[in-house]
């Protein structure tokens, strides 16, 4: 144990000794010097860049020069830390300028050294030595500039502090220097070690040699980067330090007289002619300046003497004085301001270890404030308990106190006769500065009695006593001068004042250094009394001067020249701190010398109001040309900051809002009145705590914040001014007059007298006066200057208030009868205040109504009936108790208590009995009422019967309506039952005859009972209509029946029910039926809708008739019984039964000579199904064709003209070959002039986009309408040039991928009808919004077109159709000789056309090189064909050119083609019926409904049966069951064609269409030539995103093709080859189109252009240069 104890003691002592030694070593001067030396060596890290650069180049001379320059530069920086003149000399602007110029010169010479070395010849060695010198100076100057580039004075301050505190300064300097040297050596060794290790490895060395040393570009890049970074950092450092330009010094004492003399000379007055007041002012200024001990004149003499003793550095660089102060602390009691030569921090004494030591403390202001607080603070300073010295000292004090206490106690025990008195030392003060008379300080303020840490506040002197002291102590120099110059001075010699000896006790004063000049602000310059200076020296906030009063605009007013008037009208300076207003006017003296000598200049008598904008102004109070580096660090967090804060006090500031971004809160305050209160909580809680004064302060604060917010943002004043003016005009001219008119109309309707004249008289009293932004009113029609930018207020005098009736009231005084207008049209009492509450218009009316209603007691009955009937027993008991309640005011307190106790007991008993009775009462008793309650209810019902009559009437009316509805429903059910029975009777009568039974089945038009009928007939899809029609046609054959029924003899034996049935469906018509038929009432609008079909009206107008169509449908359903019975007679079958019917009956007899046309059949049957009723049922008339009786069906021209489902699947088609008289059938009864096409049934999928041509040309509205003259030829005549057309156009056709339609049901027999799935729900096939998403420029044109369309009439296009010629030609071409002759002619024509093609193509290439080859071929072919054929037959030439451009004939068979081919046939049939075929064609191809790959290719010149047999055409062609139908040619959707079309658009001015005299006379549809070629550029046509997508997709996908198909053949390979040829031929043109018109000089700008990131702010960065095209085409 002892050993362990000894070990612990030894270890503890060793630890204490070692820790003390280590602490001494660490706190020693040597360690501190080593620490700061290493810091100075390693702090400047950027200076080693050039050293590493020299080491890498492996040149020993360069390496040595770099190291020496680095060490010398570091040494200079180290010495500048310890020597203040050197430190400031390196920071002076002049030294920086010299060093930077030398550095730039060295770099410039070093960079151009290699280029100029060859020209020197023999002086090459000296040049190389100069290169070494450049490297040395580079490293040296960079070290000296490093403190300026990266300024940080922390290290220098810390070193200065330690030098000030330590005693052994030389030891500190030596240790720091040695540490710096060791640090430099370590840095150099580390650099050599890293570079040497890398050089030893061959791989690293080879890489360095390959990419760095041998690569000259690397050094050039490094030099450029280093030079640019150095230049930027140098400019940044110049922003922190003053410019090295001599600033203009301010005027001092010697220049005051010169300034005055110059001004007097300008005014034409000699120096002798000065007034006495000016001399006094100058002498006063001179005396005040001469009295300053540190004025510049005296300092110059003293400095000349001291300059000899100062060092050379201090001579060159004056580091103690600058030309300008940063802040100018003004003092109005002195002429010049005090110079603040103290630094930001200073040294003060603080207690440390019980001793006062000098420490590095806080600023001076805080130390002075701390002294003032500590003098009166009562908190005791507790000593440091860890300090042993202070602990021992306190213990000694306690021991001494204990001894004294013990001694006193012992002395008290001694019995001594002497009375001891307690002697106390007290503090006393002299009475009235008399040392003989003293008085004690009060005990509460005496520190000797009450203890330490107490003080006494010094009593201030009275005001009169202060004035007496000031008169005695003030110097009487001016009074003595007056007495000396006065002749009557002898009268004062006997004055007793001379005999008195006035002793002036000079107080202890410190001579404060002052500036030798007086600086003024801009406001002082304006308000200067006389001779204002040329310019102000102190910056002020930017102010806006507003003219308040201009006397020139008021000529009737007298000019106010008197001083009294001037002083009354415009004061010198009035400032309103709340509104930041300053009213200023330049003052003039009474005895101005200019008034006597010179002419009177025009005085500016305008009264101005200066307003300061709420903006961050950190330059406020700064002196011009002062050094900004003296500014302390500031922190700016908010968007708008009026006052800056230091980092020390920034977090302690009061946060105004909950948001860090205060601009959002200010924006909220602009538009929402009273929103500033809602920043920290609810208004209710805050308003309860606030007093009236606090509320007023809060309101003023809010108003100031709103005003500042309006003035902070840009363009807010413009917005606010416009809103105020518009609100003023709306209020005065529109709103209030309209309200007055409405009020008086209401009064007239209520049979009261109108008050129109009185209201308008009161409205005329309301005047709107424009005011300045601060509320200064101007004239009624006079707006302030620049009111849009500087702001405006509108003041309303005697505002108008609308009342239900006018009452005479006392008028308010003019001081109260006004308000200000807000941007929302409301009224406020103050500017930017809360809107005041206006008296409600209905309030007096409602109060009067309330008083009248209270007298009537209308609601008494309803109040009694609140409780349900089941609780009537409880209610009765409570009512009985309520009658016995005592009145509290009739009894005393004792009686009240007794009554309360009795009442509580009674209530308890009653409640118990009620609960028991409630259990016993049954449901029957609950429903029954007592006699008493029934009497009450009867009485109340009788009393309230009169006001309740209106309610009863309404109730009875509702019951009546319900009764009628039920009756109608019952009658409808009865009608249905009767109809069913009648249908059964008809079925029984028809069952005898099998034929009649078939007829009954076939004409079953009734819908499924479960299916709901369509409410809008105009929106029915054609697929659904044709589905019902196909069922109707498949049920019977009308061929034999119509001829029987139309005979009057046989029709007698037919039952009248059957006659009515067939007559209703339009199959027969008799005179008896005509008499018996009920004429349906059709209104005029319905007839108008028939005449004007849906396709002729605007879609906007068409859908507005939806409600009328609904009513029309209801009226149809509510027809007479007979029509309902006849209509519903065939309603027993369902749609499910129709699915099971045999489709074989659809095929008609093949031996029939003539069949109906597809469009003819669909029009008739669809009209019979949907629009069966007519205004006048007409007899059966013949169709335009020469048809038989069995096909005679009524026809209506304006029926639905859609051609989609005109032909069923298995119906035979008439071959029209060789019969030209029926060529016109599809075009006669078609409505070509239809203006609109409903896109509701077309499915557009925008997911798969297709590049198509422009849907609507921009210049379509300005086209002139002309006519074409076409002739329709026979198919055989047109087939001879089909081959030529197809050969030229088929290259642009590409196969498409067929998409399997999942909507169709393969098992359904009628799947061909619903091939698009149009009758399914719209949720499965949503129709997209066809608002031309790719071309937003056309939306407005589309809407205009809907309202007022511009459509070409078909008569203009087909005006001269010569069908007789065609018939004569067919009759003449019966023989074979004529056929052979025509063949030879056509062959010769084709050969001539080919020869002319080659010639014209060569000519076209020379004329227009920018045209594409495909375009030239197409144009020249049309020219040749028209020129050749115009000689024979010009109309035939027009037809052929038209057919080549727009038509192609597709071979269609019925049994051989697959389903995909039949789909194409259906779509193409629809396209033939449409005028605007492009849109439907594109949509069908987009949805992959139309497959262009299956179109047959016919490579023959003439199609005959012999030729068909030779090429192996199937037998179905021999049977003459082939139909050649035209459809619009679609050109491939690839991007190449789109580029071709866009190029064609851009080259419209170069295209020359062939014309001749006949075509000019007949007229051709042409487009106006657009001279503005910029509109054809894709950037101008397309939207911003779409044009970017278009270019990128075309560039990426122009070589991609979709040739995959289930039915792909070897033809796809041919198509690819031909497309490749087109691509090679048009490659130059496409590249020209893809390449933009403007190229950018760098890649970043190119990326910014393609990805649309160049907005307005970045557009200035772009460098755009227009180039010529790549080639000349």
Swiss-Prot record:
InterPro entries: TIC214. Its main location: plastid. The chain crosses the membrane at residues 32-52, 70-90, 93-113, 130-150, 170-190, 218-238. It is found in: Plastid, Chloroplast inner membrane. Keywords: Chloroplast, Membrane, Plastid, Plastid inner membrane, Protein transport, Transmembrane, Transmembrane helix, Transport. Residues 264-302, 547-611, 1120-1146, 1370-1433 are annotated as: Disordered. Residues 264-276, 283-298, 597-611, 1380-1399, 1406-1423 have a biased composition (Basic and acidic residues). GO terms for cellular component: chloroplast inner membrane. It is a multi-pass membrane protein. Residues 562-586, 1120-1135 have a biased composition (Polar residues). One of its GO terms (biological process) is protein transport. Pfam families: Ycf1. PANTHER family: PROTEIN TIC 214, PROTEIN TIC 214-RELATED. Involved in protein precursor import into chloroplasts. May be part of an intermediate translocation complex acting as a protein-conducting channel at the inner envelope. Part of the Tic complex. This is Protein TIC 214. It comes from Cuscuta gronovii.
């Amino acid at each position: 144990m002892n050993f362990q104890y000894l070990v612990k003691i030894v270890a503890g002592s060793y630890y204490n000794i070692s820790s003390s030694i280590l602490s001494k070593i660490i706190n020693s001067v040597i360690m501190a010097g080593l620490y700061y030396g290493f810091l100075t060596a390693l702090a400047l890290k950027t200076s080693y860049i050039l050293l590493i650069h020299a080491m890498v180049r492996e040149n020993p001379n360069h390496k040595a020069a770099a190291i020496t320059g680095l060490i010398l530069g570091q040494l200079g920086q180290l010495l500048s830390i310890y020597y203040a003149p050197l430190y400031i000399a390196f920071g002076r602007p002049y030294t920086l300028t010299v060093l930077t110029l030398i550095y730039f010169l060295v770099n410039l010479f070093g960079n151009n050294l290699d280029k100029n070395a060859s020209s020197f010849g023999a002086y090459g060695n000296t040049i190389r030595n100069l290169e070494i010198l450049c490297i040395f100076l580079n490293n040296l100057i960079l070290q000296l500039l490093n403190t300026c580039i990266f300024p940080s004075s922390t290290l220098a301050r810390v070193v200065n502090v330690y030098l000030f505190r330590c005693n052994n300064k030389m030891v500190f300097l030596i240790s720091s220097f040695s540490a710096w040297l060791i640090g430099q050596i370590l840095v150099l060794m580390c650099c050599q070690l890293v570079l040497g290790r890398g050089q030893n490895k061959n791989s690293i060395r080879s890489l360095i040699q390959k990419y760095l040393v041998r690569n000259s570009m690397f050094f050039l890049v490094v030099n450029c980067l280093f030079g640019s970074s150095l230049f930027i950092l140098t400019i940044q450092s110049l922003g922190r330090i003053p410019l090295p330009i001599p600033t203009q010094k301010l005027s001092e004492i010697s220049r005051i007289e010169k300034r005055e003399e110059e001004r007097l000379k300008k005014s034409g007055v000699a120096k002798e002619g000065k007034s006495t007041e000016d001399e006094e002012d100058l002498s006063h200024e001179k005396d005040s300046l001469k009295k300053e001990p540190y004025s510049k004149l005296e300092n110059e003499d003293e400095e000349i003497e001291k300059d000899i003793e100062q060092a050379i550095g201090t001579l060159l660089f004056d580091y103690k004085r600058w030309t300008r102060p940063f802040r100018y602390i003004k003092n109005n009691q002195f002429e010049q301001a005090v110079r603040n030569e103290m630094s930001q921090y200073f040294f003060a004494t603080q207690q440390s270890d019980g001793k006062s030591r000098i420490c590095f403390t806080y600023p001076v202001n805080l130390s002075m404030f701390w002294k003032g607080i500590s003098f009166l603070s009562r908190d005791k300073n507790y000593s440091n308990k860890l300090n042993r010295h202070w602990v021992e000292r306190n213990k000694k004090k306690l021991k001494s106190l204990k001894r004294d206490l013990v001694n006193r106690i012992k002395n008290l025990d001694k019995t001594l006769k002497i009375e001891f008195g307690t002697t106390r030392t007290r503090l006393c003060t002299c009475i009235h500065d008399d040392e003989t008379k003293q008085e004690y300080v009060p005990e509460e303020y005496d520190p000797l009695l009450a203890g330490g840490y107490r003080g006494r506040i010094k009593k201030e002197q009275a005001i009169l006593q202060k004035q007496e002291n000031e008169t005695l102590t003030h110097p009487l120099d001016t009074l003595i001068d007056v007495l000396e110059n006065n002749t009557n001075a002898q009268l004062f010699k006997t004055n007793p004042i001379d005999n008195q000896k006035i002793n002036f006790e000079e107080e202890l004063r410190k001579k404060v250094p002052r500036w030798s000049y007086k600086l003024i602000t801009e406001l002082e310059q304006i308000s200067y009394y006389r001779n204002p200076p040329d310019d102000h020296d102190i910056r002020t906030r930017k102010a806006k001067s507003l003219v308040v009063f201009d006397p020139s605009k008021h000529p009737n007013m007298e000019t106010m020249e008197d001083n009294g008037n001037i002083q009354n009208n415009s004061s010198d300076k009035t400032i309103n701190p709340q509104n930041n207003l300053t009213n200023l006017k330049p003052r003039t003296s009474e005895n101005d010398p200019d008034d006597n000598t010179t002419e009177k200049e025009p005085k500016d008598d305008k009264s101005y109001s200066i307003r300061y904008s709420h903006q961050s102004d950190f330059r406020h109070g700064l002196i011009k040309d002062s050094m900004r580096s003296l500014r302390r660090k500031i922190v700016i967090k908010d968007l708008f900051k009026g006052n800056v804060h230091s980092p020390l006090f920034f977090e302690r500031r009061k946060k105004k809002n909950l948001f860090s971004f205060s601009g959002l809160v200010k924006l909220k305050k602009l538009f929402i009145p009273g929103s500033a209160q809602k920043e920290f909580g609810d208004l209710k809680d805050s308003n309860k705590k606030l007093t009236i004064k606090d509320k007023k302060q809060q309101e003023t604060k809010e108003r100031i914040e709103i005003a500042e917010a309006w003035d902070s943002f840009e363009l807010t004043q413009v917005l606010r001014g416009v809103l105020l003016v518009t609100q003023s005009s709306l209020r005065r001219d529109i709103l209030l007059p309209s309200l007055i008119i409405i009020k008086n109309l209401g009064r007239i309707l209520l049979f009261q007298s109108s008050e129109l004249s009185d209201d308008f008289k009161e409205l005329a009293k309301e005047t709107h006066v424009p005011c300045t932004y601060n509320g200064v009113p101007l004239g009624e029609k006079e707006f302030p200057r620049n009111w849009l930018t500087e702001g405006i207020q509108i003041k309303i005098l005697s505002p108008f208030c609308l009342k239900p009736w006018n009452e005479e009231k006392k008028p308010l005084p003019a001081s109260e009868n006004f308000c200000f207008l807000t941007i929302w049209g409301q009224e406020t009492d103050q500017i930017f205040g809360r809107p005041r509450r206006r008296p409600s218009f209905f309030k007096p009316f409602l109060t009067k109504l309330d008083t009248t209603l209270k007298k009537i007691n209308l609601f008494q009955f309803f109040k009694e009936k609140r409780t349900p009937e089941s609780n009537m027993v409880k209610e009765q008991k409570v009512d009985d108790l309520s009658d016995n309640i005592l009145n509290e005011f009739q009894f005393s307190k004792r009686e009240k208590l007794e009554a309360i106790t009795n009442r509580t007991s009674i209530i308890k008993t009653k409640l118990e009995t009620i609960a028991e009775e409630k259990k016993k009462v049954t449901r029957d008793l609950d429903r029954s009422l007592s006699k008493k309650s029934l009497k009450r209810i009867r009485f109340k019902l009788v009393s309230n019967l009169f006001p309740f009559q209106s309610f009863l009437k309404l109730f009875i009316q509702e019951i009546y309506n319900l009764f009628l509805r039920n009756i109608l429903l019952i009658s409808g059910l009865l009608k249905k039952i009767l109809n069913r029975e009648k249908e059964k009777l008809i079925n029984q009568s028809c069952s005898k005859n099998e034929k009649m039974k078939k007829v009954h089945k076939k004409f079953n038009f009734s819908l499924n009972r479960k299916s709901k009928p369509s409410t809008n007939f105009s929106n029915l899809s054609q697929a659904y209509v044709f589905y019902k029609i196909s069922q109707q046609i498949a049920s019977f054959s009308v061929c034999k029946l119509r001829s029987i029924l139309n005979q009057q003899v046989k029709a007698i034996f037919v039952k009248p029910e059957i006659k009515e049935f067939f007559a209703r469906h339009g199959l027969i018509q008799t005179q008896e039926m005509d008499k018996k038929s009920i004429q349906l009432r059709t209104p005029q609008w319905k007839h108008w809708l028939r005449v004007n079909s849906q396709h002729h009206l605007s879609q906007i107008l068409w859908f507005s008739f939806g409600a009328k169509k609904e009513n029309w449908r209801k009226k149809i359903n509510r027809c007479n019984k007979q029509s309902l019975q006849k209509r519903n007679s065939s309603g027993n079958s369902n749609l499910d039964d129709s699915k099971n019917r045999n489709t074989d009956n659809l095929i008609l007899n093949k031996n029939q000579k003539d069949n109906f046309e597809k469009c003819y059949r669909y029009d008739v049957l669809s009209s019979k199904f949907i629009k069966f009723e007519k205004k006048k049922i007409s007899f059966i008339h013949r169709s335009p064709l020469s048809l038989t009786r069995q096909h005679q069906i009524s026809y209506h021209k304006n029926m639905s003209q859609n051609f989609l489902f005109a032909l069923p699947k298995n119906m035979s088609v008439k071959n029209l070959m060789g019969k030209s008289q029926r060529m016109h059938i599809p075009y006669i009864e078609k409505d070509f002039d239809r203006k609109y096409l409903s896109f509701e049934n077309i499915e557009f999928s925008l997911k798969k986009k297709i590049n198509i041509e422009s849907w609507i040309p921009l210049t379509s509205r300005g086209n002139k309408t002309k006519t074409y003259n076409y002739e329709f030829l026979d198919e055989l005549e047109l087939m001879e040039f089909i081959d030529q057309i197809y050969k030229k156009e088929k290259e642009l056709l590409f196969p498409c991928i067929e998409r399997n339609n999942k909507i169709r049901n393969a098992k359904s027999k009628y799947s061909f009808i619903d091939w698009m799935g149009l009758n399914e729900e719209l949720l499965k096939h949503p129709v997209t919004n066809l608002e031309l998403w790719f071309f937003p420029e056309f939306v407005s044109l589309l809407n205009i077109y809907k309202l007022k369309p511009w459509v070409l009439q078909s008569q203009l296009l087909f005006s001269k159709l010569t069908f007789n010629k065609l018939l004569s030609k067919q009759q003449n071409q019966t023989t074979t000789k004529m056929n052979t002759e025509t063949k030879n002619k056509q062959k010769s024509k084709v050969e001539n056309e080919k020869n002319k093609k080659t010639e014209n193509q060569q000519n076209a290439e020379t004329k227009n090189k920018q045209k594409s080859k495909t375009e030239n071929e197409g144009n020249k072919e049309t020219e040749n064909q028209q020129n050749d054929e115009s000689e024979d037959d010009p109309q035939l030439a027009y037809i052929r050119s038209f057919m080549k451009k727009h038509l192609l004939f597709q071979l269609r068979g019925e049994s051989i083609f697959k389903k995909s081919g039949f789909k194409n046939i259906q779509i193409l049939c629809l396209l033939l019926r449409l005028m605007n075929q492009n849109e439907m064609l594109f949509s069908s191809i987009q949805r992959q409904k139309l497959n262009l790959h299956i179109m047959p290719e016919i490579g023959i010149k003439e199609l005959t049966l012999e030729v068909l047999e030779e090429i192996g055409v199937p037998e179905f062609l021999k049977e003459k069951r082939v139909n050649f139908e035209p459809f619009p040619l679609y050109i491939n959707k690839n991007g190449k064609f789109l580029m071709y079309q866009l190029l064609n658009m851009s080259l419209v001015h170069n295209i020359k269409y062939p014309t001749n005299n006949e075509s000019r006379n007949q007229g051709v549809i042409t487009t106006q030539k657009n001279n503005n070629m910029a509109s054809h550029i894709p950037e101008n046509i397309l939207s911003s995103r779409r044009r970017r997508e278009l270019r990128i997709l075309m560039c990426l996908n122009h070589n991609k093709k979709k040739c995959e198909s289930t039915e792909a053949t070897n033809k796809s390979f041919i198509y690819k080859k031909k497309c490749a040829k087109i691509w090679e031929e048009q490659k130059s043109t496409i590249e020209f189109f893809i390449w933009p018109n403007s190229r950018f000089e760098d890649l970043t700008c190119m990326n910014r252009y393609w990805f649309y990131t160049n907005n307005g702010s970045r557009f200035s960065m772009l460098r755009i240069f227009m180039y010529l095209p790549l080639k000349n085409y």
